[in-house]
UniProtKB/Swiss-Prot annotation:
Protein species of origin: Geobacillus stearothermophilus
Family statement: Belongs to the SecY/SEC61-alpha family.
GO biological process: protein transport
Upper taxonomic lineage: Bacteria, Bacillati, Bacillota, Bacilli, Bacillales
Subunit structure, as described in the record: Component of the Sec protein translocase complex. Heterotrimer consisting of SecY, SecE and SecG subunits. The heterotrimers can form oligomers, although 1 heterotrimer is thought to be able to translocate proteins. Interacts with the ribosome. Interacts with SecDF, and other proteins may be involved. Interacts with SecA.
Function: The central subunit of the protein translocation channel SecYEG. Consists of two halves formed by TMs 1-5 and 6-10. These two domains form a lateral gate at the front which open onto the bilayer between TMs 2 and 7, and are clamped together by SecE at the back. The channel is closed by both a pore ring composed of hydrophobic SecY resides and a short helix (helix 2A) on the extracellular side of the membrane which forms a plug. The plug probably moves laterally to allow the channel to open. The ring and the pore may move independently.
Membrane topology according to the record: Multi-pass membrane protein
Record-level GO cellular component terms: plasma membrane
Protein name: Protein translocase subunit SecY
Residues forming coiled coils: none
InterPro entries (UniProt xref): SecY/SEC61-alpha (IPR002208), SecY_dom_sf (IPR023201)
Transmembrane portions of the chain: 38-58, 60-80
Keywords: Cell membrane, Membrane, Protein transport, Translocation, Transmembrane, Transmembrane helix, Transport
Compartments, as annotated in UniProt: Cell membrane
């Protein structure tokens, strides 16, 4: 919430360089948030459509098709699995310090 973020920055004495605290900060954060949302949504749309486009261009069999959303899910699960494996390795590394 840009309004809440601007208020919190103002209360804590923080500011964005070149932007006055208060309403100007709120408008700036809103503008940046809209830009990031637009870029992110365009990127996700391209990722979702690209696999279908390549499958149709390469004339692959229907069994080889994978949708963009499926690709996003697979990558998300793979990244989460890597994080969990890394945390387990770190946990094992620190187990020697506990004993």
């Amino acid at each position: 919430n840009p309004e809440q973020m601007a208020e919190n920055l103002k209360k804590q004495g923080g500011y964005i360089p070149g932007i006055r605290p208060g309403k100007n900060t709120q408008e700036y954060v809103t503008r940046i948030l809209y830009r990031l949302t637009l870029v992110g949504s365009v990127f996700l749309a391209v990722i979702a459509v690209l696999p279908v486009f390549f499958v149709n261009v390469a004339n692959l069999p229907p069994s080889a098709k994978i949708g963009g959303t499926s690709l996003l899910i697979v990558v998300g699960v793979a990244l989460e699995t890597m994080k969990q494996l890394e945390s387990q390795l770190v946990k094992r590394h620190y187990r020697g310090f506990i004993k």
